[in-house]
Amino acid sequence: MDPKAGGGGEEDDCVDSGAETGGSDYSHLSSTSSELSVEEAQDPFLVSIHIIADPGESQPLQEAIDNVLAWIHPDLPLFRVSERRASRRRRKPPKGAQPALAVVLFLQEEYGEEQILQLHRTLQQPPWRHHHTEQVHGRFLPYLPCSQDFFTLAPGTPLWAIRPVHYGKEIVRFTVYCRYDNYADSLRFYQLILRRSPSQKKADFCIFPIFSNLDVDIQFSLKRLPCDQCPVPTDSSVLEFRVRDIGELVPLLPNPCSPISEGRWQTEDHDGNKILLQAQRVHKKFPKPGRVHHASEKKRHSTPLPSTAVPSHTPGSSQQSPLNSPHPGPIRTGLPPGHQQEFAGRANSTPNPPWSFQRSKSLFCLPTGGPSLASSAEPQWFSNTGAPGHRASEWRHGHLLSIDDLEGAQETDVDTGLRLSSSDLSVVSAYSAPSRFCSTVETPLPSERCSSHWAAHKDSREGPLPTVSRVTTEASWASLPFFTKRSSSSSATARAAPPAPSTSTLTDSSPQLPCDTPKVKQTDGDMPPPPGSAGPGDNDMEEFYI
């Protein structure tokens, strides 16, 4: 079969970045992941999406997303659904508005057309709803009539689409639609944040490789819209990127970038899409479970951290990064080519706003260090030794996080920028320890369809995964049951239940580990408003906390 069959036709004819199948010339690099470096391929959560739901709607939306992603892999938490404190009035979008964010799933065609059609039927059931069908004007028409349909979960959330893969791997692709005039600037912007160049690049489309292993690719792409189309930012979704050397990155960004917590910064791209930057804590040491109490006692008598200003980088500067980076000074070698001179000029001319953080006990996040962290500190997507049950147990019991160790994230409202007190923190990060990894009982997959699909088309690929670019055991991540045998008649090795809606505040009088069943206080509409929040007249103001 011609690899472009169903691929959207000529290069400039198709607006949809996902119209090209996984086997087209746009994404042929999905079969050449060995060319990626370890740093580029080792973090599957380099890009994630926060979905912001109205009160009471987070759980069904989270389950709907998990059920769809289970067709790619049942333990791939790339999306976190959180709730607002109160519903908001929706502004009617302009006619023909194009949401700026989309998620495209490429499924293997060789396992049968019925599998793709079955998932397509799932996307036609609530809470999913049909959004639009893309019109293809190229020389080749898609052989599956559903391959140009787009769906959505709720207003202001990303579009979703299903595409067949003629050859290569299954793919999860995040797509940002750009204004025609802003495409080149957006390309440079995301190239700077992702610290890499696109693997495929055309006049109106490019692909950044995010993560790759034996069966799955995670990609980030940009699509240039025609002049007469304008992307609308998804006001109920926020893209989040893990970044390194935040102090070096901030002066290079085109729009203001402000800290909303100790580890997160907020900015916008050229089209007004909100972006969260999560700073990686390189070489962060986590106390052992037996020493948590001792560490907390030590911290009670320690002096608070002084206010730290973003360093003004000048040639020869050796100041340490604000996030305790082990490097003696700014590392410009990691920047994409062409940004070194821009960094030197803008760092000297841009004022550096001071920032400081207070410590609280309301937030815990997954460690975000580099490959030199201890193997028990990060999920392992490359090493796959041992029995599946042993790997799952090892992840649950070995990946314990100390809330006391991660004290100190005074958060601010993502949309308003208003600073919140510790009692107002009501949403756990997309990188928090999911409850399914803390539970010792495994439950079946959300649907029997997903279980049978996994067993039908994954059994032939079981076994240890090869390391990428000779990853050593010390640099590998803590065991995550990535490829485990699933069967429609067995639920012993199925995915654990999805986490509850992230609308709780951790309350504790002494430090506890997240998996040690901390006390949880549910927060509803009676939660006190954050300090300095808007009055009753500002009901449209976003109330989502990261």
UniProtKB/Swiss-Prot annotation:
Residues 24-36, 488-511 have a biased composition (Low complexity). InterPro entries: FAM124, FAM124_dom. Residues 304-324, 347-360 have a biased composition (Polar residues). Pfam families: FAM124 (PF15067). Residues 1-37, 286-360, 488-546 are annotated as: Disordered. Residues 286-302 have a biased composition (Basic residues). The gene is FAM124A. It comes from Homo sapiens (Human). Belongs to the FAM124 family. This is Protein FAM124A.
